[in-house]
C-alpha cells in the first residue's frame, strides 16, 4: 500500500536541469586559480581545457567571443586565474565551468604586462637608437636616483670614490619598491632636470625578483626617462635582469657598480696619460733644443775656420793632447806597478799559515760549544721525560691510592671484594693498608639500598 504523500520522482532530464539551475543561481560567478592541462581548440574557435591543482580537477570551456579578449595563448602547465560560471552540461550530466575571462597568475601576469608594455613603447619608438643621448666625457657631476639605504647606492659611491674622488655626486633619494616607488622615481627624474645640477643620471637599484624590480617596468618611469634632457644610465638589478627602463635609457649598465664605472674617469689612468704626454713634450723640447744647438755649433765652427788664429789654436790643442797622453801613460805605468806590488803582497800573505790556524781554532771552539749545548739540551730533555714518567707512575700506583686513606680487601680465595654478597658471616678477610695488612673476621653483613630519584 503506497503512503498518502508519495515522494517527488525526477526524470533524468529534470534532475540534471534542477542541478544546473541550483549551481548557476546559488554559486554565480567565482574566481578560480589552477594549472591548465588538456588544452584544445577545435575549428569552432572555442577553448576546452582542464583546470587542476594537486588533488582535484574540473573541466572548463571558454567560448570564442570570450577567449578573443585574452591577450596571451594558454599553454599546458601554465598557472592562470579565471572568472567563470559553474554549470552542468545536461545531456551528459557533466559538471563544468564556463570561463568568462583569463589572465596569468603571479609572475606570469607580470611577465605578460611587461611584454605588452615593451611592445607598446617599442612601437612608439621610445627604444630607437636615434633618441639615445651621448654620455658626457668627462662627467662633471653625477646624479644618483635610488634608495638612500640600499646596497646599490653604497656600490656606486664606493666605485666613484675609488676611480674619481673629486667627481661631485648628488643623490636624489627615492623608494625603489612598492606602490609609491614609480611616482617617486618620476618626481626625482623631473627634479634633477629642473635643478640641472648634473650632466648624467644613474637610475637603478640592487637585484631582486620580478615583483621587486617592477617599479622600473612602470610606464610612467619609462616615459620620464625618455623625456629627461639629462642622459640616463639604467642600473637595475643584476646582469640577467632586464627592465623597460633599460630599453628606454640612453645606456644600460648590467649592475650599479658598472654604471659608476661608465660615468666616471679613472684618475690613475688620467695621471698616466698626463705623465706620458709630459714625457713626450719634454722629449720634443729636448730634441728641438739639441737640434738648434747643433746648428749653432756648425755655424760657429764655419766662422772659426776663417779665423787667422785657427792654426795656432790647433797646434796648441795638439800640444795639450800630447801632454795629456804622456801624463796618462805615466799614471797608467805607475798604477800597473802598484797593482803588481799589491798582488805580490797578497800572494805572500796567503802563504802565511797563521790565518789558517786562527780559523781552525775558531772552528774548533764553535764545534765544542755546539757539542756542549747539544749535550745540555738532550740531558735536560731526558731529565724532564724521566720526571714526567715518575710523576705518571706515582699517579697510577695503587700505593698512592692507599696513601690517600683507601684500602683493598680480599677474601680467603684472594679475590678483591667489591660487593657484600661475595662474603658470609664468619669468613676471614685480609685488608691491605698503606703500611701493612689486617686480618679480620666478618661479624655482620648489612647491604646498603640505593635510592632512585624520581624524574618529574
Curated annotation (Swiss-Prot):
Any one GO cellular component localisation term in the record: exodeoxyribonuclease VII complex
Catalytic reactions on record: Exonucleolytic cleavage in either 5'- to 3'- or 3'- to 5'-direction to yield nucleoside 5'-phosphates
GO BP term (any one): DNA catabolic process
Compartments it resides in: Cytoplasm
Keywords associated with the record: Cytoplasm, Exonuclease, Hydrolase, Nuclease
Example GO molecular function: nucleic acid binding
The organism's place on the tree of life at top rank: Bacteria
Record has Protease as a keyword: no
UniProt cross-references to Pfam families, sorted A to Z: Exonuc_VII_L, tRNA_anti_2
Major location (coarse): cytoplasm
Enzyme Commission (EC) number: 3.1.11.6
InterPro entries, per database record: Exonuc_VII_L (IPR003753), Exonuc_VII_lsu_C (IPR020579), OB-fold_nuc-bd_dom (IPR025824)
Top EC category: hydrolase
Quaternary structure note: Heterooligomer composed of large and small subunits.
HAMAP family: Exonuc_7_L
The protein's role, per its UniProt record: Bidirectionally degrades single-stranded DNA into large acid-insoluble oligonucleotides, which are then degraded further into small acid-soluble oligonucleotides.
PANTHER family noted in UniProt: EXODEOXYRIBONUCLEASE 7 LARGE SUBUNIT (PTHR30008:SF0)
Annotated family: Belongs to the XseA family.
Name of the protein: Exodeoxyribonuclease 7 large subunit
Species whose genome carries this gene: Shigella boydii serotype 18 (strain CDC 3083-94 / BS512)
UniProt lineage: Bacteria, Pseudomonadati, Pseudomonadota, Gammaproteobacteria, Enterobacterales
Amino acid at each position: 500500500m503506497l503512503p498518502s504523500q508519495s515522494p517527488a520522482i525526477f526524470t533524468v532530464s529534470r534532475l540534471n536541469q534542477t542541478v544546473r539551475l541550483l549551481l548557476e543561481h546559488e554559486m554565480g560567478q567565482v574566481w578560480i586559480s589552477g594549472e591548465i592541462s588538456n588544452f584544445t581548440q577545435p575549428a569552432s574557435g572555442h577553448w576546452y581545457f582542464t583546470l587542476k591543482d594537486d588533488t582535484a580537477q574540473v573541466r572548463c570551456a571558454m567560448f570564442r567571443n570570450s577567449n578573443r579578449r585574452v591577450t596571451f595563448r594558454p599553454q599546458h602547465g601554465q598557472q592562470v586565474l579565471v572568472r567563470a560560471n559553474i554549470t552542468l552540461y545536461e545531456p551528459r550530466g557533466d559538471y563544468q565551468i564556463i570561463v568568462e575571462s583569463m589572465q596569468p597568475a603571479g609572475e606570469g601576469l607580470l611577465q605578460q604586462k611587461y611584454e605588452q608594455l615593451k611592445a607598446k613603447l617599442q612601437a612608439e619608438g621610445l627604444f630607437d637608437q636615434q633618441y639615445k643621448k651621448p654620455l658626457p666625457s668627462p662627467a662633471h657631476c653625477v646624479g644618483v636616483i635610488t634608495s638612500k639605504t640600499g646596497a646599490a647606492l653604497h656600490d656606486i659611491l664606493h666605485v666613484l670614490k675609488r676611480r674619481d674622488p673629486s667627481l661631485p655626486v648628488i643623490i636624489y633619494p627615492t623608494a625603489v619598491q612598492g606602490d609609491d616607488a614609480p611616482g617617486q622615481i618620476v618626481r626625482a627624474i623631473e627634479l634633477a632636470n629642473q635643478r640641472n645640477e648634473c650632466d648624467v643620471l644613474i637610475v637603478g637599484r640592487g637585484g631582486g625578483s620580478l615583483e621587486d624590480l617592477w617599479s622600473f617596468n612602470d610606464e610612467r618611469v619609462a616615459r620620464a626617462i625618455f623625456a629627461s634632457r639629462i642622459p640616463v644610465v639604467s642600473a637595475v638589478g643584476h646582469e640577467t635582469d632586464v627592465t623597460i627602463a633599460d630599453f628606454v635609457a640612453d645606456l644600460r649598465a648590467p649592475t650599479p657598480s658598472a654604471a659608476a664605472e661608465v660615468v666616471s674617469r679613472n684618475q690613475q689612468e688620467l695621471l698616466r696619460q698626463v705623465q706620458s704626454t709630459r714625457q713626450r713634450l719634454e722629449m720634443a723640447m729636448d730634441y728641438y733644443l739639441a737640434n738648434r744647438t747643433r746648428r749653432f755649433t756648425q755655424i760657429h765652427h764655419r766662422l772659426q775656420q776663417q779665423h787667422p788664429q785657427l792654426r795656432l789654436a790647433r797646434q796648441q790643442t795638439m800640444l795639450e793632447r800630447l801632454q795629456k797622453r804622456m801624463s796618462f801613460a805615466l799614471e797608467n805605468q805607475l798604477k800597473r806597478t802598484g797593482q803588481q806590488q799589491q798582488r805580490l803582497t797578497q800572494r805572500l800573505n796567503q802563504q802565511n799559515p797563521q790565518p789558517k790556524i786562527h780559523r781552525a781554532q775558531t772552528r774548533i771552539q764553535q764545534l765544542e760549544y755546539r757539542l756542549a749545548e747539544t749535550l745540555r739540551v738532550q740531558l735536560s730533555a731526558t731529565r724532564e721525560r724521566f720526571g714526567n714518567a715518575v710523576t705518571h707512575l706515582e699517579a697510577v700506583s695503587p700505593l698512592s691510592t692507599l696513601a690517600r686513606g683507601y684500602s683493598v680487601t680480599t677474601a680467603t680465595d684472594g679475590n678483591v671484594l667489591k660487593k657484600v654478597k661475595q662474603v658470609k658471616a664468619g669468613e676471614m678477610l685480609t685488608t691491605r693498608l698503606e703500611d701493612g695488612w689486617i686480618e679480620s673476621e666478618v661479624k655482620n653483613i648489612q647491604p646498603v639500598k640505593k635510592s632512585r630519584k624520581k624524574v618529574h
